């Protein structure tokens, strides 16, 4: 019964999301945490272009912080409700330039002495279009550095799942924005 309900909801929602995607080439995530805030924009001119991810995050400790797209656009229990990294292809964790990685693996952002991270990167797997869209999922910045799937010893197993990036400092749902 639950699966039937889930199928009905999916069939009702996804055509609307796909129609909306055809009207916009841009999405936004407003990140909120206890002390960390930010705004991240994702722009993709067409389905065949790379996504451009840019924005600013404030309130971080100086240094590197894991930066990912997570599976769910759910914040009912804080950022933990966002679930694992977005991974539609069933890969292990890696860095943004790794051949094997989750779609959501965007590496690290670096906060300066002022606690601000300015972000501008491109990505070939993140997309605003089609069945693997990041729209409706969550953008998360972590308290610690992502080891890009290269952890060793007792950190190796978790490294292949999360990059050992630590607690979730802030998150926000990735929503469609007005076209640019």
From Swiss-Prot:
GO terms for molecular function: copper ion binding; protein homodimerization activity; superoxide dismutase activity. Cu cation binds at residues 68, 70, 85, 142. Disulfide bonds join 79-171. One of its GO terms (cellular component) is cytosol. Residues 1-19 form the signal peptide. Its cofactor is Cu cation; Zn(2+). The insertion of copper which activates the protein requires glutathione. This is independent of copper chaperone for SOD1 (CCS), which activates orthologs. It is found in: Cytoplasm. InterPro entries: SOD-like_Cu/Zn_dom_sf (IPR036423), SOD_Cu/Zn_/chaperone (IPR024134), SOD_Cu/Zn_BS (IPR018152), SOD_Cu_Zn_dom (IPR001424). Homodimer. This is Superoxide dismutase [Cu-Zn]. The gene is sod-1.
């Amino acid at each position: 019964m639950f699966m039937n309900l889930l199928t009905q909801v999916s069939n009702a929602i996804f055509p609307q999301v796909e129609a909306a995607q055809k009207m916009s080439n841009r999405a936004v995530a407003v990140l909120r945490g206890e002390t960390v805030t930010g705004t991240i924009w994702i722009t993709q001119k067409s389905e065949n272009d790379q996504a451009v991810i840019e924005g600013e995050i404030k309130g971080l400790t100086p240094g590197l912080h894991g930066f990912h797209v997570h599976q769910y656009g759910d914040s009912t229990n804080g950022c933990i409700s966002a679930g694992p990294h977005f991974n539609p292809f069933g890969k292990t964790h890696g860095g943004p330039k790794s051949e094997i990685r989750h779609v959501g693996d965007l590496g690290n952002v670096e906060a300066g002495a002022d606690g601000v991270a300015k972000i501008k990167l491109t990505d070939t797997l993140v997309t605003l279009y089609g069945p693997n869209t990041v729209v409706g999922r969550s953008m998360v910045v972590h308290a610690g550095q992502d080891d890009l799937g290269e952890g060793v010893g007792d950190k190796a197993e978790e490294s292949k799942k999360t990059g050992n990036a630590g607690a979730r400092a802030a998150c926000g749902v990735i929503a469609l924005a007005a076209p640019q």
